[in-house]
Curated annotation (Swiss-Prot):
Catalytic residues (UniProt): K69 (schiff-base intermediate with d-ribose 5-phosphate)
NCBIfam families attached to this UniProt entry: PRK04180.1, pyridoxal 5'-phosphate synthase lyase subunit PdxS
Catalytic reaction list: aldehydo-D-ribose 5-phosphate + D-glyceraldehyde 3-phosphate + L-glutamine = pyridoxal 5'-phosphate + L-glutamate + phosphate + 3 H2O + H(+)
Name this polypeptide is given: Pyridoxal 5'-phosphate synthase subunit PdxS
Binding, D-glyceraldehyde 3-phosphate: R153
Gene Ontology molecular functions: amine-lyase activity; pyridoxal 5'-phosphate synthase (glutamine hydrolysing) activity
Family assignment from sequence similarity: Belongs to the PdxS/SNZ family.
Single biological process term from Gene Ontology: pyridoxine biosynthetic process
Subunit structure as annotated in this protein's UniProt entry: In the presence of PdxT, forms a dodecamer of heterodimers.
Functional description taken from the UniProt entry: Catalyzes the formation of pyridoxal 5'-phosphate from ribose 5-phosphate (RBP), glyceraldehyde 3-phosphate (G3P) and ammonia. The ammonia is provided by the PdxT subunit. Can also use ribulose 5-phosphate and dihydroxyacetone phosphate as substrates, resulting from enzyme-catalyzed isomerization of RBP and G3P, respectively.
EC number: 4.3.3.6
Keywords per UniProt: Lyase, Pyridoxal phosphate, Schiff base
Pathway entry: Cofactor biosynthesis; pyridoxal 5'-phosphate biosynthesis
Length: 280
């Protein structure tokens, strides 16, 4: 299991200047994008992989690992990112899907992949395809953490259900989830996914980030919540501290002070496009 990012924050950035802010704030990695999820959602239309030139500029600006997104099922975009030396590929529902049925066969790549999931079945199917990290889908670009909470609770609930099964019941569960038996057996024996399980989608405050850690996330992705806020530098540092000290309300309270205005956000009831429904 690749645990190098565990206990850390991965931040969306659109420029090398933002990447430097993220690195200085203590981010364990950055996600290079042309537009953060809030702007992708606002613009509508078809969203695709970012310009490789932009990604390479961000890669050259920081020493921490750089990730980038590809459309679901678009293995050529993934090949491009691998060719330029990206550290991690996110097969992401935030971009417009290229294939409504198939995901990328991640086992064909030497570069590791992270994928989104709303439940245990989605998580294990992505892992069976070769994903090395799972994140909750949440609802990116909203600043509303409710879906990330829902997805994390669902995954943890289903993990606990599998833990309670008898050995002979695991085969039925594997069939129901449409995943290999050995993955279900791992969850049963270890009480967790066989890869890191991060949270993403709607995290906007230090308290949000700490909440996701308390619910069982190994780490946190933060997208629009930092660079759509009033004081990105201070908020980025505060979220990193909250993730490190997620069990300490006093520290979280201190770092939450005077952060400037948080991103305005979109209530889940106002959302027209549900990105989390892409790619099951």
């Amino acid at each position: 299991m690749d645990t190098r990012f565990n206990g850390g924050v991965i931040m969306d950035v659109t420029t090398k200047e933002q990447a430097i802010i993220a690195e200085e704030a203590g981010a364990v990695a950055v996600m290079a994008l042309e537009r953060i999820p809030a702007d992708i959602r606002a613009a509508g239309g078809v969203s695709r992989m970012s310009d490789p030139k932009l990604i390479k500029e961000i890669m050259s600006a920081v020493k921490i690992p750089v990730m980038a997104k590809v459309r679901i099922g678009h293995f050529v975009e993934a090949e491009i990112l691998q060719a330029i030396g990206i550290d991690f590929i996110d097969e992401s529902e935030v971009l417009s899907p290229a294939d409504s049925v198939h995901h990328v066969n991640k086992r064909d790549f030497s570069t590791p992949f992270v994928c989104g999931a709303r439940n245990l079945g989605e998580a294990l199917r992505r892992i069976s395809e070769g994903a090395k990290m799972i994140r909750t889908k949440g609802e990116a670009g909203t600043g509303d953490v409710v879906q990330a909470v829902s997805h994390m609770r669902q995954i943890i609930k289903e993990i606990n259900l599998v833990k309670a099964l008898r050995e002979d019941e695991l085969y039925v569960m594997a069939k129901d989830l449409q995943v290999p038996y050995d993955l279900v057996k791992y969850v049963h024996d270890n009480g967790r996914l066989p890869v890191p399980n991060f949270s993403a989608g709607g995290v906007a405050t230090p308290a949000d980030a700490a909440l996701m850690r308390r619910l069982g996330a190994d780490g946190v992705f933060v997208g629009s919540g930092i660079f759509k806020s009033g004081d990105p530098k201070k908020r980025a540092k505060a979220i990193v501290e909250a993730v490190k000290n997620y069990n300490n309300p006093e520290i979280i309270a201190k770092v939450s002070e005077d952060l400037g205005e948080a991103m305005v956000g979109i209530n889940e009831n106002e959302i027209k496009i549900i990105m989390a429904e892409r790619g099951v």
